Amino acid sequence: EWNDALYRGKWELAYKILTSTNPFPEFTGRICPALCEKSCVLQLTMHEPTTNREDECAIMERAWQESYIVPCPPEKRTGKSVAVIGAGPAGLSAAWYLNRQGQTVDVYDANEKAGGLLRYGIPNFKLQKEVIDRRIHLMEAEGIQFHYGVRVPLQSDSFSMEELEKAIGKHDAYVIATGTPTARDLNIPGRELKGVHLALDLLSQQNRILEGELPDAKDLVTAQGK
């Protein structure tokens, strides 16, 4: 439906239809592998497949440029508080919908910025971090509060609700959306060799450096020359 609206030049309608089922098309429009395009039935009629990924991105950029996207805080709050643990894609989606329903939402994350693997696992050439920041600013303007550098001991053997409330305070409900920040190791020959590293570790480190986060080190050497 949103592709049809786009075809007819109705950009704002396309935006409304698209975001009715996807809160963050500006993310999926950049990083989705677009597997659906390979199965598009238009190819059976000598046409090119629909460019869903590029269309999503174009619709959202037009929406930002034309100010279709503006802060829309809920008119009425329910009086209920929800804590979302994890500011990755799942946590952000949960926070977005809960806030729209009128809940008071607090998002907690161990990192210094929101986004999870969107920020720390995907290179800038695929997803510029300004795109993430733009969305986070909108969510803040709608009343969602973000708390960074907060580690919740969910993996502890002695984990309890008392520990959870001690770490982030008492809420009416909790959404655990910590995601998968750890890479899946491979049990293959040569994995134990020196110099063989997991790609996710490398991507995370590189993205953190680009964000201005220096890795822990006792000594820092700076070389300058002409």
Predicted regions located by residue number:
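Short, compositionally biased low-complexity segments
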Residues: 27-33, 109, 137
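Residues forming the flavin
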Residues: 56-226
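Hydrophobic or amphipathic alpha-helical targeting/insertion segments
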Residues: 33-46, 146, 170-177
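General structural signal for alpha-helix termini and helix-helix connectors
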Residues: 20, 24, 38-42, 120
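Catalytic cores of large soluble enzymes that bind and process phosphate-bearing ligands
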Residues: 3-7, 24, 28, 32, ...
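General secondary-structure edge motif
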Residues: 12, 16-20, 35, 78, ...
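Ferredoxin-type iron-sulfur electron-transfer modules in oxidoreductases and energy-metabolism complexes
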Residues: 1-30, 46-76, 206
